[in-house]
Amino acid sequence: INDPTIPAIPTDCSNQGAYNDLGGAKGIIGVNPLPYDNGSYYTCSGTSCSANNNVATAQQIVSPVYAFSSDNNGVIVSLPSVPSGGTTSLSGTLTFGIGTQSNNQLTAKNIFTSNGTEQDGSFTTTYSNGSYDSIFDTGSTELFFDTPSNQPALTVCSDNSGFYCPASTTTISTQLSSLGGGNNMNFDFSIINFDNYIQANPNSVAIPNAGATGGQN
């Protein structure tokens, strides 16, 4: 917003821009299942700012979808598959509302009930006999996770810190589960060497199978 009365942006906000630059994005909008963005906020006084994790709901950023007068119960994000070599352009659709109009019906679906009580919209992922809180987030450009202690650690990239760079493409098997059970789905995915991929595909705007450490999310 660049309000001149507000002090300098805290570095833990401004440092995030490097990942937008890497992806060639002007900006990234993330849509999650929650009506309010219960993330990190700051309270500023004079020239100093400090983190404030107790911002009243009425002062939090409202999801633009939730603010609609109708068709506000969710979104459908539809994108085509990305080839292994990436692509220089990708187009999809963002449909507002689910089951509210003739053109936003779900014909094939796996429904995962998320954890609304903790205000994070999470469900459960089982990976290598461990259970982890997980989310679907349209603003996350990679698969964020940490390697369990009972699995060989994935090599972290030297050129792009925080991303994974295994010696060869690595397949990981997980199971996704709704809150309280009720619906389970096996989810296998692969992780590429991110450094090698970027060098070979410098103009790619959609990168399949990119992984990063969970600490970045």
Predicted regions and their residues:
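C-terminal catalytic lobe of pepsin-like aspartyl proteases
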Residues: A67-S69, V77-N217
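Aspartyl protease catalytic domain
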Residues: I1-S131
